[in-house]
């Protein structure tokens, strides 16, 4: 693999097309693919209202302390520092997306949201589309897994937006095991959209959410996280779908209070990074192995290169089998 940071970025902007020929026909369910957790949170807006999914205690906290409260919230809610374009160029191919409307918005605009509102959905999708236009053999997974204040008319608007932005690059639903890089390249598909809402049953290019399970450890303890990840990967072989391993720690209220001014990255992510990276490097992709791996602050600890490198173990296996 490329040794310098600059070479790494160049390599990983087209890492899928750079994989060995022996991996082009392997189902994408069997490859190791780096993804980002709360992918849009690089652009959480402190000037925005609090998201509708937040509990009353948070709403009251913000109403009393205003901008100061939102600045502190951002330190814990923003899990990424790179925008979509930078993530794509660095090698990220899976995006964890949460959609919300703003209260009393006459335009019915759709936003990415996690506690506070982020960029508009259209802005984000257009960034992704621009990247794909100049990287024709790269493929992305868009996982729309939370919807806040989203009614049927908003779902219809989002579906139309996806059609407009991506057009013929949207891959219709087929058996997950059929989807390889070779299959997608031949048909010129670049986008798989997973949609955790019954609307997925009505639209040919919306893959049902159950085809992208992403079990969540919900712990601040790195050891418990690793045990959970290991158990969920073992359980994965019974599903026959894509699969997300969320290598992320979730702060409790007490954790936030202890490190309220330092934030998620400094208080939790950086401290746990060595053990999380050790687990990733010990994994192998394949039918019973890891598939999509997501993290907070994906630029840390050579996370992206570590995940992509796992695919080269598959190549060694393929060569040894021939």
Swiss-Prot record:
Highest taxon in the source lineage: Eukaryota
GO annotation terms (biological process): lipid catabolic process; signal transduction
GO cellular component: synapse
Active-site residues per Swiss-Prot or TrEMBL entry: 37, 114
InterPro entries: PI-PLC_domain, PLC-like_Pdiesterase_TIM-brl, PLCXD1/2/3, PLipase_C_PInositol-sp_X_dom
TM region(s), chain numbering: none
CDD domains assigned: PI-PLCXD1c
The keyword tRNA processing is assigned to this record: no
Keywords: Hydrolase, Lipid degradation, Lipid metabolism, Transducer
PI-PLC X-box domain residues: 22-197
SUPFAM superfamilies: PLC-like phosphodiesterases
A GO molecular-function descriptor: phosphoric diester hydrolase activity
Pfam families per UniProt: PI-PLC-X
Name the record gives this protein: PI-PLC X domain-containing protein 3
Organism lineage: Eukaryota, Metazoa, Chordata, Craniata, Vertebrata
């Amino acid at each position: 693999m490329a040794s310098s940071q600059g070479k790494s970025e160049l390599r990983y902007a087209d890492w899928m097309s750079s994989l060995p020929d022996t991996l082009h026909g392997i189902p994408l369910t069997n490859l190791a693919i780096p993804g980002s957790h709360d992918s849009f949170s690089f652009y959480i807006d402190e000037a925005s209202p609090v998201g509708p999914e937040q509990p009353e205690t948070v709403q009251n906290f913000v109403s009393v302390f205003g901008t100061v409260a939102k600045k502190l919230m951002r330190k814990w809610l923003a899990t990424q520092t790179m925008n979509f374009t930078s993530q794509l160029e660095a090698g990220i191919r899976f995006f964890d997306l949460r959609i919300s409307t703003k209260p009393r918005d006459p335009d019915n605009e759709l936003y990415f949201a996690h506690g506070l509102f982020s960029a508009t959905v259209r802005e984000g999708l257009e960034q992704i589309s621009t990247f794909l236009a100049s990287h024709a053999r790269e493929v992305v997974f868009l996982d729309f897994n939370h919807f806040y204040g989203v009614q049927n008319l908003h779902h219809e608007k989002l579906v139309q937006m996806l059609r407009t932005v991506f057009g013929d690059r949207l891959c219709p639903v087929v058996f997950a095991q059929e989807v390889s890089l070779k299959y997608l390249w031949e048909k010129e598909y670049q986008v798989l959209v997973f949609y955790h809402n019954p609307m997925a049953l009505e639209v040919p290019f919306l893959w049902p959410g159950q085809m992208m399970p992403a079990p969540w450890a919900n712990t601040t303890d790195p050891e418990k996280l690793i045990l959970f990840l290991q158990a969920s990967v073992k359980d994965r072989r019974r599903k026959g779908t894509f699969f997300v391993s969320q290598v992320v720690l979730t702060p409790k209220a007490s954790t936030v209070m202890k490190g309220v001014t330092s934030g998620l990255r400094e208080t939790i992510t950086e401290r746990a990074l060595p053990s999380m990276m050790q687990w990733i490097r010990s994994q192998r992709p394949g039918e019973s192995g890891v598939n999509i791996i997501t993290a907070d602050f994906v630029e840390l600890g050579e996370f992206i290169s570590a995940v992509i490198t796992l695919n080269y173990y598959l190549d060694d296996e393929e060569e040894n089998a021939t």
